[in-house]
Amino acid sequence: MAHADVRNAFTAAWVMQVSFDPLLLALSINPHHSSYGLLKDGRAFSVNVLKKGQLALAAHYGRPAGPDNKLALMEWTTGRIGVPLLLESLAWFECRVVGEHPAGDHVLVLGKVIDGKLLDSKAEPMAYRETGGMDGASALFPAVFGD
C-alpha cells in the first residue's frame, strides 16, 4: 500500500481473483490492522505472490508494523500507481481500490488490476497450508461446529 510518501506491506492470508472482466482481485484485512488506514487513504495496493519456500519473507511482512520500515531490508520498486513491488516475488499485481465489503471481523477490499508481471516462471506459489498456521487462525476455530 502507499499514500503520499508512506509505503507498507503486510502478509494477507486471503487473496482471490473475483472477476475476469474487469480483472478484479479481493483481499481480506482486519480493519484494526495498521495497514488498513494506509490502504483506505491511498486507495491502491499491490499483491506480491510469494514463492514456495519464502516463509521467512511471509513472516517478516506478517509481523506488526511498529516504527520499523518493513520494506527497508528488501529489494523493491515502485509501480505505476505508487505501490511497492517486491523484486523477490514470483509475480505482482498493482490494484486500485474499487470497493469494500464488511466480512465479519475483516473487510474484503476489491481492487481493479492496473498492471502485473510474472517474475519467475519456474517457481511455484506459496500456499496458505505451507505457513504452518503462522497467523494463529486455527486456534480460532471451535472444536465442534454447532447450529
PLM region spans:
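Basic, polyanion-binding surface patches
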Residues: 1-147
